[in-house]
Amino acid sequence: MTKTEKKLRHYITKAIADYKLLDKGDKVMLCLSGGKDSFGLLKVLHGLIEDKTYDIDLHVYTLDQSQPGWDDSQLRKYLDDLGVSYEIETKNTYGVVIDKVPEGKTYCSLCSRLRRGNIYRYAKEHKMDKIILGHHRDDLIQSLLMSILYQGQIKSMPPKFVTQDGENTVIRPMVLVQERDLIEFAKEENFPIIPCNLCGSQENLKRKKVKKLIQDLALENPKVPSNILNSLSNVLPSHLMDRNLFDIDATIK
């Protein structure tokens, strides 16, 4: 086991313990997009199950969105060799996105909603206890700033949440994992990564701008990324302006 994998194991098991993400006997569905993050999570979590660290029933779900150039042959071979239960479901969400999104606009929002809808549907149909997503620490940091800058809200990606209809529980075991470690792990393991040609062709994405902003700030102060992450668990409601968080009448007497 490499130092990188040991590091990933440490932060993943810490998040699972800190936020009580898994219970004994859980039937869980890990969403494998074909990218480095979900591949890394799968490899580590599968190893932890093999080592008897977790007693859970793991099922891998991949959504083929019918994007041009999609080839999952190597992904299938990888999953077969790993020996995990999996299903690759084909839904032409790509066609819907191309039809609905005006030229020049980004596809990410609609694409994500359609993908999320299929994930939730599949989880309910197969009576999954939990849905596992591969978002990492940098995703949380970027999402917080994006919400503030572009939506006027303070929110990010929680380690665990229940969907609005109460039907699905979603967990993110990699909320403490840095992207750079996942990049290194993907190189070490030579995962059969499937690039997202749809997203990759759109250069002016908001997330890329925010990511660059954080990187620039970190050059001046390396603690910036960790400070942003820590802010998500160090909230001072009395220092905000949401009237639902405090008694406005009491504060003006």
UniProtKB/Swiss-Prot annotation:
Its EC number is 2.8.1.-. It is found in: Cytoplasm. Gene3D superfamilies: HUPs. Keywords: 4Fe-4S, ATP-binding, Cytoplasm, Iron, Iron-sulfur, Magnesium, Metal-binding, Nucleotide-binding, RNA-binding, Transferase, tRNA processing, tRNA-binding. Binds 1 [4Fe-4S] cluster per subunit. The cluster is chelated by three Cys residues, the fourth Fe has a free coordination site that may bind a sulfur atom transferred from the persulfide of IscS. This is tRNA-cytidine(32) 2-sulfurtransferase 2. One of its GO terms (molecular function) is ATP binding. The keyword Lyase does not apply. The thiolation reaction likely consists of two steps: a first activation step by ATP to form an adenylated intermediate of the target base of tRNA, and a second nucleophilic substitution step of the sulfur (S) atom supplied by the hydrosulfide attached to the Fe-S cluster. The gene is ttcA2. Pathway: tRNA modification. GO terms for biological process: tRNA thio-modification. It is an enzyme of class 2 (transferase). A motif (PP-loop motif) lies at residues 33-38. [4Fe-4S] cluster binds at C108, C111, C199. GO terms for cellular component: cytoplasm. Pfam families: ATP_bind_3. Homodimer. Its cofactor is Mg(2+); [4Fe-4S] cluster.
